[in-house]
């Protein structure tokens, strides 16, 4: 009973730490991907690390830069050979030619959509990952450990294939020189499980700035750009000692 966040917060407090946390959207920190993860900052004593303000936003407002898109980071890569990606299933190859860039199964004609989705057609929820073709003009959706899972398909914007492992690595901001090992499925898993470089850099730099005395005061600046797409996901929004789980939204895609 109770949440993991509340448990961790109480344990840190017992050890004498002051914590701050939020659900951060990686796209708001220069990552070409909508990937939302909780980051908890902790300091021994009464000082609190302020939450880092977004450097990017969808429209580039309030002094932020515009989101980095998928096309921005993969457009210069050469066409991959077949050893650099897992092929789509026969079923996907049957229907994906009908899906345009940035669309998914909902763009199909009703009868075709019902046939393509099979039993999944009757499932609840948005099902936005089914027969999903990415858009070059938007950040990638959250990369998962396999790009060809039916409910979370990561299909290239214009080609009949998923993103290659090199494209996966670009989205997660690995240097091109980074060497991965193992089978192609293992490499996808390694990359999909990683923390995007920009998100880790944001957290690390905030700690360094705090340690160097560059952050004045314990309070956050006025947050004009939301940290994520969801509400009530920071330590200021939630009463740690009496959390109402209905107010804690942690629905990751």
Regions found by a protein language model. Give the residues of each.
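S-adenosyl-L-methionine-dependent DNA methyltransferase catalytic core
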Residues: 11, 37-186, 190, 194-253
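Conserved Class I SAM-dependent methyltransferase catalytic core
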Residues: 1-34, 38-43
């Amino acid at each position: 009973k109770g949440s993991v966040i509340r448990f961790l917060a109480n344990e840190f407090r017992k050890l004498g730490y002051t914590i701050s946390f939020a659900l951060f959207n990686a796209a708001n920190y220069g990552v070409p991907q909508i990937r939302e993860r909780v980051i908890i900052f902790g300091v021994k004593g009464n000082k609190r690390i302020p939450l880092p303000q977004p450097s990017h936003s969808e429209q580039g407002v309030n002094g932020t830069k515009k989101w980095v898109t998928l096309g921005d980071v993969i457009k210069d890569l050469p066409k991959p050979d077949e050893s650099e990606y897992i092929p789509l299933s026969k079923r996907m190859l049957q229907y994906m030619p009908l899906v345009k860039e940035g669309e998914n199964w909902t763009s199909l004609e009703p009868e075709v959509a019902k046939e393509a989705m099979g039993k999944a057609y009757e499932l609840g929820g948005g099902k936005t990952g089914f027969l999903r073709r990415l858009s070059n003009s938007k950040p990638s959706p959250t990369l998962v450990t396999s790009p060809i899972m039916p409910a979370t398909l990561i299909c290239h914007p214009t080609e009949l294939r998923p993103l290659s492992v090199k494209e996966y690595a670009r989205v997660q901001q690995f240097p091109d020189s980074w060497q991965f090992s193992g089978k192609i499925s293992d490499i996808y898993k390694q990359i999909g499980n990683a923390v995007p470089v920009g998100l880790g850099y944001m957290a690390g730099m905030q700690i360094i700035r705090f340690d160097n005395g560059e952050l004045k005061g314990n309070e956050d600046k006025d947050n004009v750009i939301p940290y994520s797409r969801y509400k009530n996901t920071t330590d200021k929004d939630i009463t740690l000692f009496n959390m109402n789980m209905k107010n804690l939204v942690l629905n990751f895609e």
